[in-house]
Amino acid sequence: MTMLAAKADPMTLSMGPHHPSMHGVLRLIVTLDGENVTDCEPILGYLHRGMEKIAENRTIVQYLPYVTRWDYLATMFTEAITVNAPEKLTNIQVPKRASYIRIIMLELSRIASHLLWLGPFMADIGAQTPFFYILREREMIYDLFEAATGMRMMHNFFRIGGVAVDLPYGWVDKCLDFCDYFSLKVDEYERLITYNSIFLKRVEGVGTISREEAINWGLSGLMLRASGVQWDLRKVDHYECYDELDWQVQSQTEGDSLARYLVRIGEMRESVKIIQQALKVIPGGPYENLEARRLNQGKDSEWNDFEYQFISKKPSPTFKLPKQEHYIRVEAPKGELGIYLIGDDSVFPWRWKIRPPGFINLQILPQLVKGMKLADIMTILGSIDIIMGEVDR
């Protein structure tokens, strides 16, 4: 019997949007030829909340609680960039103790972010067990956050000139105990995952980005370092006290999903080293909170003026942003998180431009998935690690 070969028409498939607690409200319009991906178009904007415009109608202190809603899995970094921008613009010096406290909190937040990437990423490619392991360690980090800041998430801990409160009694010892415990758990993750043959078949050679492509697309963070570019803003920009600590930039040369996994594993190890060193050499002195100092001016405080007795009668008495512009950036878990701030001799920013790492890194997704299998889309998308709160802003 003769069989006639018929070419099927391309099929268009809509992936997402999902719930924000899952893969986020990202929609992918995928065109398929059988199982092969021929085109992919990301649709954004489902989680847009106008964060930049809100910033232009708030003082920096009023805006701080909003920024933890960008990347809600690494909120310390959004707080850090929000206070760093006016600090650089107005040349405010941060006490050494406050700088060390910031480093400790940032690196704990980096570990928590990488952990909550690792669990769902493994679940996406068919391994459920690591998801429960990472929640166990992440819970310990959140306990440390709760003891120091009062909040497990959305900490609202950073302040202009320092941090909100000093570390509580006994917190340093608890954090050191966690670091000793977690170092062994990273070894456990590696034994469980890294050399697993099924895992390697799903990630090795999938979503490869060359060194030149990574630079030309403007990628940042571990997307850049996994392609052989040793670029880490903690080393490049010398912010906080990172230069006083001994640690190495983690990088790989292959540029595939496996390389991005290995960089994250390496970064968790380095973060533990940074935290341990910072806890052992953290100096004494003030932790500084400029806004709290304003409140403690006694009876003559500007806060006691009649104009402030009624809500919205007058903006809170805070410092004015000079008529200057400045770009400030930090090395967030997902890449370069930046703020372009323009002051206008007002308590409100004239322009507050957010450079989210996920938005820039997501650009390369259509190129990576073309020619791949449908099942590889979740592997590649997961290896990029995006949070739609910061992508859509």
Curated annotation (Swiss-Prot):
Disulfide bonds: none
Gene: ndhH
E.C. number: 7.1.1.-
Function in brief: NDH shuttles electrons from NAD(P)H:plastoquinone, via FMN and iron-sulfur (Fe-S) centers, to quinones in the photosynthetic chain and possibly in a chloroplast respiratory chain. The immediate electron acceptor for the enzyme in this species is believed to be plastoquinone. Couples the redox reaction to proton translocation, and thus conserves the redox energy in a proton gradient.
Gene Ontology biological process: photosynthesis, light reaction
Reactions accelerated catalytically: a plastoquinone + NADH + (n+1) H(+)(in) = a plastoquinol + NAD(+) + n H(+)(out); a plastoquinone + NADPH + (n+1) H(+)(in) = a plastoquinol + NADP(+) + n H(+)(out)
Lineage: Eukaryota, Viridiplantae, Streptophyta, Embryophyta, Anthocerotophyta
Keyword entries, A-Z: Chloroplast, Membrane, NAD, NADP, Plastid, Plastoquinone, Quinone, Thylakoid, Translocase, Transport
Segments passing through the bilayer: none
Family annotation (InterPro entries): NADH_Q_OxRdtase_suD, NADH_UbQ_OxRdtase_49kDa_CS, NDH1_su_D/H, NiFe-Hase_large
Annotated localization: Plastid, Chloroplast thylakoid membrane
Domain of life (superkingdom): Eukaryota
GO molecular function: NAD binding; oxidoreductase activity, acting on NAD(P)H, quinone or similar compound as acceptor; quinone binding
Protein's UniProt name: NAD(P)H-quinone oxidoreductase subunit H, chloroplastic
Record membrane topology: Peripheral membrane protein
GO cellular component terms listed in the entry, alphabetical order: chloroplast thylakoid membrane
PANTHER family cross-referenced by the UniProt entry: NADH DEHYDROGENASE [UBIQUINONE] IRON-SULFUR PROTEIN 2, MITOCHONDRIAL, NADH-UBIQUINONE OXIDOREDUCTASE 49 KDA SUBUNIT
Enzyme class: translocase
Protein family according to the UniProt entry: Belongs to the complex I 49 kDa subunit family.
Subunit: NDH is composed of at least 16 different subunits, 5 of which are encoded in the nucleus.
Keyword presence, Transmembrane helix: no
Biological source species: Anthoceros angustus
One Pfam family in the UniProt entry: Complex1_49kDa
